[in-house]
């Protein structure tokens, strides 16, 4: 009997996640109970983008000695991250507002489980140092490379910037390229104009790229953590996930209280230059909280704007996919 394409794809993504993941961490799974639930047999796969969440957790050492197993699965952008999410290959995923909405349209099992508060200055439209482009108006008739894919926070920022100057998306030629590939091409001057986000944004700016417009006044600055329904419906996994979320909240508090220490660890773990790492950490979505009504309202406005701009094919009802409080039971 032949496997269905969807099953084969899921197995392939599980293998990718396993290769990308770090070795199992947390020591031997002891018979320890969290919130009355035995989590000793649980293994969580924690998705990540460009190593940011892992760097935070390891810098603050919040996952040391947990009573369950976990491993990291790192992806270069939201598109491949949410492909793994949809396949059930990961239990937790961090992403910006619009990628979460984009993923939700293709994945009815996706749920938002936490809010992370950052800065809209963590992304922007950049050009080469010698570029004649200096304002958004100068983009008209030119090619703009957007990372990572359709439905990214950078696409939302680009469209918002164009609208400010009376331009339409059709006034530029938009091309989508994954950020690692786009970074290499921008460094080689094969890309002239790039709409991207941290850490890639912070890195190229420190290397001399000129900022045409950042996300201030356009993007929300919010990011989110999501989890699949299957994970949330598994009592032991949900208990372990609730514990991870609480620990990540503490990690964010530590990083905000020790910015220099965190920047140093972040630079070491990601191999970014210290100056770029310091910039990125200062803008990063570190403060974490349960999803509030205000967060839902902000994300709903993003969803409605993105649908009006045809970035999203239809409206997303944010309240229907948000879990205000992920408890262990």
PLM regions: where:
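Short, glycine-/small- and polar/acidic-enriched structural segments
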Residues: 35-165, 175, 192-195, 210-219
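Conserved C-terminal helix/tail region of periplasmic/extracytoplasmic solute-binding proteins
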Residues: 306-329
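Pocket-lining segment of extracytoplasmic ligand-binding domains
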Residues: 180-268
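Secondary-structure end/capping motifs
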Residues: 234-311
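Sec/Tat-exported extracytoplasmic proteins
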Residues: 89, 94-97, 104, 143, ...
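N-terminal secretory signal peptides
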Residues: 1-8, 16-23
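Short helix-loop capping/hinge motifs at secondary-structure junctions, enriched
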Residues: 130-137, 167-168, 230-241
């Amino acid at each position: 009997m032949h496997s269905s394409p969807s099953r084969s794809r899921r197995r392939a993504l599980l293998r990718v996640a396993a290769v990308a993941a770090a070795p199992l961490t947390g020591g031997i799974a002891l018979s320890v109970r969290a919130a009355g639930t035995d989590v000793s047999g649980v293994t969580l796969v924690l998705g990540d983008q460009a190593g940011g969440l892992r760097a935070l957790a390891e810098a603050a050492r919040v996952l040391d000695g947990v009573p369950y197993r976990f491993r990291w699965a790192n992806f270069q952008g939201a598109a491949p991250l949410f492909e793994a999410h949809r396949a059930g290959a990961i239990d937790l995923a961090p992403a910006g507002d619009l990628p979460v909405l984009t993923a939700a349209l293709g994945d009815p099992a996706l749920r938002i489980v936490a809010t992370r508060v950052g800065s809209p200055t963590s992304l922007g439209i950049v050009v080469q140092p010698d570029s004649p482009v200096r304002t958004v108006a100068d983009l008209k008739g030119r090619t703009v490379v957007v990372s990572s894919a359709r439905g990214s926070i950078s696409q939302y920022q680009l469209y918002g910037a164009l609208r400010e100057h009376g331009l339409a998306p059709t006034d530029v030629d938009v091309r989508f390229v994954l950020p690692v590939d786009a970074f290499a091409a921008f460094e080689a001057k094969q890309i002239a104009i790039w709409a991207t986000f941290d850490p890639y944004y912070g890195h190229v700016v420190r290397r001399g790229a000129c900022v045409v417009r950042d996300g201030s006044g356009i993007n929300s600055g919010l990011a989110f953590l999501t989890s699949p329904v299957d994970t949330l419906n598994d009592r032991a996994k949900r208990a372990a996930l609730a514990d991870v979320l609480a620990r990540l909240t503490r990690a964010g508090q530590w990083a905000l209280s020790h910015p220099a220490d965190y920047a140093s660890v972040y630079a070491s773990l990601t191999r970014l230059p210290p100056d770029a790492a310091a910039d990125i950490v200062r803008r990063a979505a570190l403060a974490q909280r349960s999803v509030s009504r205000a967060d839902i309202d902000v994300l709903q406005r993003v969803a409605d704007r993105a649908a009006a701009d045809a970035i999203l094919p239809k409206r997303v009802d944010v309240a229907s996919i948000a879990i205000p409080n992920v408890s262990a039971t």
